[in-house]
């Protein structure tokens, strides 16, 4: 019989300005070589460009992330010597994680000179359902839809 209790969930880091875990996660994703103050300045400047009101800019960020979040993803399942790509539902925590990662990577692929302008423009594009992050989500959904014939072979 197992004697250990379940793993303790660590609280995700909330940022001091917005007191929201999503903004803290975005700051940590943008951070390069441990330079957190530089990353925080990039994220806060981009959010300030969205709206001077903090609450409104946070709501706009959350709406953009909602537009980026995927509802299904492809998992590779090996059966009978062949690998199949099986669509699977995603839990809400992973949805948010993927959305933040895709937002950051799409923003940093953009051509603007400054990082905060790139992030700002990517958030605006996500709000209007355009841009690299939304394109990536649509690609994942397209793959899941194309492979729905294998959805009967999900685990559990």
From Swiss-Prot:
Ribosomal protein recorded as keyword: yes
**What does UniProt list as this organism's lineage?**
Bacteria, Pseudomonadati, Pseudomonadota, Betaproteobacteria, Candidatus Tremblaya
According to its UniProt entry, this protein's organism is Tremblaya princeps
This protein's GO CC annotations: small ribosomal subunit
Q: Which GO terms describe its molecular function?
A: rRNA binding; structural constituent of ribosome; tRNA binding
Q: Belongs to which family? A: Belongs to the universal ribosomal protein uS7 family.
Q: Which HAMAP family match?
A: Ribosomal_uS7_B
Q: Which domain of life is it from?
A: Bacteria
Oligomeric state and partners? Answer: Part of the 30S ribosomal subunit. Contacts proteins S9 and S11.
* Name the UniProt record assigns to this protein: Small ribosomal subunit protein uS7
| Keywords, in A-Z order | Ribonucleoprotein, Ribosomal protein, RNA-binding, rRNA-binding, tRNA-binding
Q: What function does this protein fulfil?
A: One of the primary rRNA binding proteins, it binds directly to 16S rRNA where it nucleates assembly of the head domain of the 30S subunit. Is located at the subunit interface close to the decoding center, probably blocks exit of the E-site tRNA.
GO BP term, pick one? translation
